[in-house]
Amino acid sequence: MTNSTDRPVSVSSWRTYRRLVAFAKPYRLLLVAALIAALIEAAGTTGFLALMKPITDETFIYKNAEVSRWLPVQIILLFVVRGIAGYITDMAMGKSARSIARDLRIKVMAKYLRLPGSRFDSEPVPSMLIRLGSDSDQVAQAAVDAIKVMIQQSLQVIGALALMLWHSWQVTLTILVLAPVLAWVMDKVARRYRRISHSIQESGAHLLQAADQTLSSHQEVKIYGAQQTEMERYGALADRNLRLAMKVESTRGISTATVQMIGAIGLSALLFVAGAQALAGRLTAGDFVVLMTSMLTIIPGLKQLTNVQNMVQRGLASAERLFSVLDSPDEPDQGAVALTRAKGLIEFRDVTARYPGQVNPALADVSFIAQPGTVTAIVGRSGSGKSSLIKLIPRFYDAEAGQILLDGQPVQAYALADLRRQIALVGQQVMLFDGSIAENVAFGEMRSADASQLERAILGANAMEFVAQLPEGLQSHVGAKGGRLSGGQRQRLAIARAMLKDAPILILDEATAALDNESERLVQDALHKLMPDRTTLVIAHRLSTIEHADQVLVMDQGRIVERGTHHELLAQGGLYSHLHGMQFRERQA
């Protein structure tokens, strides 16, 4: 069925930054406000450092009483302004960054719903949840915390350096000799964080997938005594995640120690050159204190800038994972033929279909016609291609060769939304959402249905007998995946949903395979009310349920090997007769 590069880190980062900037455009006023406030905050820090000269010279050396009176007031005012600016920075950055993450999350979710069915075969749902959950949060965290720290600390470092240049350019230039070494260290740290971040996120997705599989199948795990096996598998994945996390910690530790060592060398150079300047009479005690406090402000700022690289690179790696989804091609949808309500004539002409990466086709040269208002049953052993055939009609997948026609037109000629509007589906695994019964029946485009339409559908599906007994009736919540209801009750709600849709084509995918006799009787009765005047395709496990079908297609290894009515196929004594005989003997036993 049709349907980690080694790019240079700097190029990849720049492309990702540019795309994130596009998402930031709606919030540019907030970001400008955050930048202005950050400038004021940095200016406050620089102003405080500048006050070190009059504090030292005027207060302690020249004993100037007037300065001692106005300096405390000035410091208080300075920090009030700085605090207000910091609050504005935090709020503006937080609002814009969280909004960007929300927009990304919504766009990725919408994109997943437009992707072809093959994507859901190749990417497990836990991986999708990682992208929608933690990846989006990582982008927000990088934008809120990391970018905020980078802006604030960068401005403070620049302000402190400017102040140092003003007081002694000779001392400052001596220290700036170390800048290329520091830049090299930070670049190496960023590259390493970037590589590890990708691996950690993939490792986290594998951990979540393993936990989802084990916990979802907890009954089988307990029955077969597989707890130890599953824990060993999960433990191995957790160990790999730990090793990657320790690489991050190792990188952080080494980079922090290196930055501190460079800072210590710079501080030593400052003391040496400043001492020489003071002996020559070119540097006062106040100048020295300003240089010293500025240097002591720069060192932790550089340390924070180095440490925050991990957060930034995690955010960029997460953004790339999200963008890879957004860049995936949508389901092909170029249909232009108008379709309000189909007659329901379905024709397969020499259809061959193959799943991606598979050598053998799922379907091979399949041809048949389903007339409007008739019932076509599709039977065969497990893996014979029954479900694959059904998935081609609503174009969850596209055929590799041949044609599928609806009312004489290839299904590709219709817009996907119009085509799928003609189809109602009742499967073996009914998916109900965590909401009320009414919300689950009047689902999607049917949410505008009135109460009388909803009640008729519920009654027709034989569901009112249990709905009426619930405390809140139609407004009763069904729980996650319909967990508060039995299998038969969920199935009848699915039939009510199909009745309310009133589509001309009905697909029943083993709708009664997992039900007990009483539930099956109620569901079969509801289906008999639903099927008239529709083109119905039934995948049947219990052959006794399709004895009155207008035609039966018997499939084996992706091909139709027999076709005819129930009685005609029994008389032929072929595969259908064999399958029917096996089921009859099982019932007798």
UniProtKB/Swiss-Prot annotation:
Any idea which positions bind ATP? G380, R381, S382, G383, S384, G385, K386, S387
Where is this protein found? Answer: Cell inner membrane
> ABC transporter domain: which residues?
346-582
This protein's superkingdom?
Bacteria
Listed GO MF terms:
ABC-type oligopeptide transporter activity; ATP binding; ATP hydrolysis activity; ATPase-coupled lipid transmembrane transporter activity
Q: Does the keyword GTP-binding apply?
A: no
The organism named in the record is Xanthomonas oryzae pv. oryzae (strain KACC10331 / KXO85)
Q: What is its EC number?
A: 7.5.2.6
Q: Which UniProt keywords apply?
A: ATP-binding, Cell inner membrane, Cell membrane, Lipid transport, Membrane, Nucleotide-binding, Translocase, Transmembrane, Transmembrane helix, Transport
Q: What is the annotated role of this protein in its UniProt record?
A: Involved in lipopolysaccharide (LPS) biosynthesis. Translocates lipid A-core from the inner to the outer leaflet of the inner membrane. Transmembrane domains (TMD) form a pore in the inner membrane and the ATP-binding domain (NBD) is responsible for energy generation.
Membrane topology type, per the record?
A: Multi-pass membrane protein
Asked if the Swiss-Prot or TrEMBL record annotates the protein with the keyword Cell inner membrane, the reply is yes
Question: Which named protein is this?
Answer: ATP-dependent lipid A-core flippase
Q: State whether it acts alone or in a complex, and with which partners, per the record.
A: Homodimer.
Q: List the disulfide bonds.
A: none
Q: Which Pfam families match?
A: ABC_membrane, ABC_tran
Q: Residues in domain ABC transmembrane type-1?
A: 32-314
Q: Which InterPro entries match?
A: AAA+_ATPase (IPR003593), ABC1_TM_dom (IPR011527), ABC1_TM_sf (IPR036640), ABC_transporter-like_ATP-bd (IPR003439), ABC_transporter-like_CS (IPR017871), ABC_transpr_lipidA (IPR011917), P-loop_NTPase (IPR027417), Type_1_exporter (IPR039421)
Instruction: Tell me where the transmembrane regions lie.
Output: 29-49, 70-90, 157-177, 261-281, 283-303
Fill in the domain comment: In MsbA the ATP-binding domain (NBD) and the transmembrane domain (TMD) are fused.
- A Gene Ontology term for the protein's cellular component: plasma membrane
Q: Its catalytic activity?
A: ATP + H2O + lipid A-core oligosaccharideSide 1 = ADP + phosphate + lipid A-core oligosaccharideSide 2
Q: Which family does it belong to?
A: Belongs to the ABC transporter superfamily. Lipid exporter (TC 3.A.1.106) family.
